[in-house]
């Protein structure tokens, strides 16, 4: 499978696994809000960092965050819990890409409970901070194809919202 179906795309392609990133964070007192749970802004920082690392690995350029979709907090996170943040590219355009970031709390026995999922749009920048072309994305599995198709739908919705001034 290829990133551009029906078109000849001469760009070099990279696998999803080439740029995937996983980080872990121990929740400390400095990360907590007044209710004793992980501060949402801290989690957003970790998500953005992982999305940026995925983007940088894929694009091999500096990256900026253009937008975040579907940022939903499913469960709270508490002191001394371990947060696992996993990012991967789901869609690649000419200069931008979508990065899916999943977040889990990992228990002491290694079991992971999902707490968050978000989709970031990242744009690659050249030395003059202008958008620059990036490698294509090689789609190899049915799951990656499903993610690609879903990402295209989300992209269309973002474009429509932009046209509406939102």
Spans of model-derived segments:
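A short small-residue
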Residues: 25-31
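A conserved, well-ordered hydrophobic junction motif at loop->secondary-structure transitions
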Residues: 32-44
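Hydrophobic beta-strand-centered segment that forms part of the acyl-chain substrate-binding groove
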Residues: 16-18, 38, 52-86, 90-97, ...
């Amino acid at each position: 499978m290829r990133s551009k179906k029906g078109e000849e795309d001469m760009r070099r392609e990279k696998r999803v696994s080439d740029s995937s990133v996983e980080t872990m964070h121990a929740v400390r007192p400095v990360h907590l809000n007044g209710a004793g749970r992980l501060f949402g802004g801290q989690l957003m920082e970790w998500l953005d960092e992982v999305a940026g690392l995925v983007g940088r690995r894929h694009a091999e350029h500096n990256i900026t965050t253009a937008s975040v979709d579907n940022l939903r907090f499913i469960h709270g996170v508490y002191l001394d819990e371990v947060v696992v943040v996993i990012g991967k590219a789901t869609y690649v355009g000419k200069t931008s890409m979508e990065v899916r970031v999943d977040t889990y709390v990992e228990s002491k026995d290694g079991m992971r409970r999902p707490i968050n999922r978000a989709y970031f749009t990242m744009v690659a920048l050249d030395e003059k901070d202008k958008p620059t072309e990036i490698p294509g994305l090689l789609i190899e599995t049915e799951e990656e194809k499903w993610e690609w198709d879903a990402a295209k739908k989300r992209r269309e919705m973002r474009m429509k919202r932009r046209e509406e001034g939102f």
